[in-house]
Amino acid sequence: MAGRNEPPNALRHDLRRGEIIWVLKQDYPHLVTFRHLQLALRDRNIPLSERDLVSYLSYLEEGSYVRCVRRFDESDSLERILAAALTARGILLLDNKLTDAGVRF
């Protein structure tokens, strides 16, 4: 159960996606490595596991708000996200010219 000052789960996920877009905006249009993004979010008091960050980036990528560079890791038989960059559509979302119910700022 969420504490008094914690937003409900759905809202928390929406806000985290918004924070990811905000962090990527700082380096637009350049790529930000996965680890750098993870550390930048941690500096903003949003520590995310690799699995959670992949989930958020995948959601944002499906909406064409971010572009992810991936590599297949043969040792784990998994595709890993190496870096991400904000797209022009992501800028429009950040500037409130587009709306997405799953992203809040």
Where is each model-derived feature located?
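Short, amphipathic alpha-helical interaction segments positioned at domain boundaries
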Residues: 81-105
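Short acidic/glycine-enriched loop/turn segments that link adjacent beta-strands
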Residues: 77-79
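Short acidic, hydrophobic short linear motifs in intrinsically disordered regions
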Residues: 30-41
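Short amphipathic alpha-helical interaction segments
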Residues: 47-63, 81
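Exposed, interaction-prone assembly regions rather than primary DNA-binding/catalytic cores
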Residues: 2-4, 23-26, 39-40, 46-51, ...
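A short, conserved structural fragment
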Residues: 61-74
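Short alpha-helical segments that sit at the start of domains
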Residues: 1-31
